[in-house]
C-alpha cells in the first residue's frame, strides 16, 4: 500500500462489532478502508459502511477460517495478491441484503447451527481452521429445535416449522459448497 502512495493505519479489532463501530466513527477520514479478516469481520465493516451517507472505497484481504465470500467473488487466496487487487482498484459490485434494519453481505440465517461461528472459540479457529466449526456444530446436535416462521416473497407465502433458513449471496456457507 505504501508503495502505491497510501498512508497506512492499522487497527486490530478487539471484540465483536468493534469493526462496525470503528467504521461508523472514522470512515469519513479515509479514501479507502481495507478489511483483512474473515467473513464475519467483512460483514461488520460493510454493516458500518452502510450506515454512512458517503462511503470510502472498500478493499478486502481474506484472512479468516473459511473465506466463503472471498471465494464467491473470486478474490485470490494469497493475502499479497488480494492486497494487490485492493490497491489496483479492481472494483466489483455486490448485493447488500437487508434483514429487518440490519444489513448483510454474506448471509442472514436463523435456526440450527447459526450460532456456531460466534460460539467457536477464536483459539480453536486459529489452530484448526474450518474443522473447528464442525466440532462446535456437533456439540449442538442434541439441542436442535424448530422455529415457526412465515416467509413472504414476491409470488406467495410459506408458513411452517423450520429447522434452518438462510438468505445468502455466496456460493458456499461455512466452507460447504453446493448448499446454497
Language-model regions: role of each:
Residues 41-53:
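Short Gly/Thr/Asp-enriched flexible loops that form oxyanion-binding sites at enzyme active sites
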Residues 37-38, 64:
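A short acidic Gly-Thr/Ser loop motif
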Residues 11-13, 51-167:
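Catalytic core of DAGKc-family lipid kinases
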Residues 40-42, 67, 173:
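Glycine-rich nucleotide phosphate-binding loop and flanking beta-alpha elements
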Residues 1-36, 43:
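ATP/NTP phosphate-donor binding region
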Residues 166-180:
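Internal helical hairpin/lid segments
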Residues 19-22, 46, 92, 136, ...:
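A generic local structural motif
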Residues 44-46, 70-71, 176-177:
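Short glycine-/acidic-enriched loop or helix-start segments at secondary-structure transitions
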Amino acid at each position: 500500500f505504501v508503495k502505491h502512495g497510501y498512508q497506512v493505519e492499522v487497527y486490530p479489532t478487539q471484540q465483536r462489532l468493534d469493526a462496525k463501530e470503528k467504521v461508523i466513527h472514522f470512515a469519513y477520514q479515509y479514501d479507502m478502508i481495507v478489511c483483512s479478516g474473515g467473513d464475519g469481520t467483512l460483514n461488520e465493516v460493510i454493516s458500518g459502511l452502510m450506515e454512512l451517507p458517503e462511503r470510502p472505497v472498500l478493499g478486502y484481504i481474506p484472512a479468516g477460517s473459511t473465506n466463503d465470500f472471498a471465494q464467491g467473488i473470486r478474490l485470490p487466496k494469497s493475502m499479497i495478491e488480494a492486497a494487490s487487487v485492493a490497491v489496483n482498484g479492481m472494483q466489483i459490485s455486490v448485493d447488500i441484503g437487508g434483514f429487518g434494519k440490519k444489513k448483510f453481505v454474506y448471509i442472514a440465517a436463523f435456526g440450527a447451527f447459526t450460532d456456531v461461528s460466534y460460539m467457536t472459540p477464536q483459539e480453536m479457529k486459529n489452530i484448526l481452521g474450518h474443522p473447528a466449526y464442525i466440532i462446535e456444530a456437533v456439540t449442538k446436535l442434541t439441542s436442535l429445535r424448530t422455529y415457526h416462521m412465515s416467509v413472504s416473497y414476491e409470488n406467495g407465502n410459506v408458513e411452517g416449522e423450520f429447522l434452518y433458513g438462510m438468505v445468502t449471496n455466496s456460493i458456499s456457507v461455512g466452507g460447504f459448497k453446493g448448499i446454497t
